[in-house]
Amino acid sequence: MKITKNILKAEFIKRPNRFQAYVKINEKIEMVHVPNTGRCKEILIPGSTVILREENNENRKTRYDLIAGYKGDMLISIDSQIPNKVVYEALMNFKIEILKEYTNIKREKTFGKSRFDFKLEKENGEVYYLEVKGVTLENDGLTMFPDAPTERGTKHILELIDVKNKGMGAGVLFLIQLNGVKKFTPNHKMDKNFGEALRLAKEKGVDILAYDCLVEESSISLNNPVSIEI
């Protein structure tokens, strides 16, 4: 997907809280919004190059969103709104192999008391619920989720097991917001409960998927499946 708004580079200075950061643009210090509540501490390093998206919204306190950062030569998208958009585009273009037969794609749908990112249906009425998780944590080709404890994420995984137990399809797709990685694994050290929930989900028949992305400064799209170690 193309990012149609104005894109520019800046130098990262600091991040005083989850939602705000300070960057340097043409020698001027500017406060920007960070659309990711994760820690991203391996990416947002003082002096590193980051990518900003200009919002031009008079009702905002900040003019820019900090949407990506360079880790060496590797560009990593950190915008938490991007994964669902990328996966939606991929579903509409039948790029996810095991989900190609699902032609009716609905976003943000509930099942019982649970809300999932996607509800998919085949022409024969078969239903599949899909949850998407964005991944930004990478170390020497190994990617992990989460980068901070996530009770909400664990709850989603357990809810997918419930969907599967009721006879419907269920899956979680980890969208790795960078390119050229080797493997994905749950971050057991950061959140043991999430890792255990994911292992149980796999045992119960929930599909566990991981894809990396082609990331450029003004675009991002689904790329290739990534091997998973649970």
From Swiss-Prot:
An example Gene Ontology molecular-function term: DNA binding
Record-linked Pfam families: SfsA (PF03749), SfsA_N (PF17746)
NCBIfam families in the record: sfsA (TIGR00230)
InterPro entries: SfsA, SfsA_C, SfsA_N
Disulfide bonds listed in the record: none
Name of the protein in its database record: Sugar fermentation stimulation protein homolog
Family label: Belongs to the SfsA family.
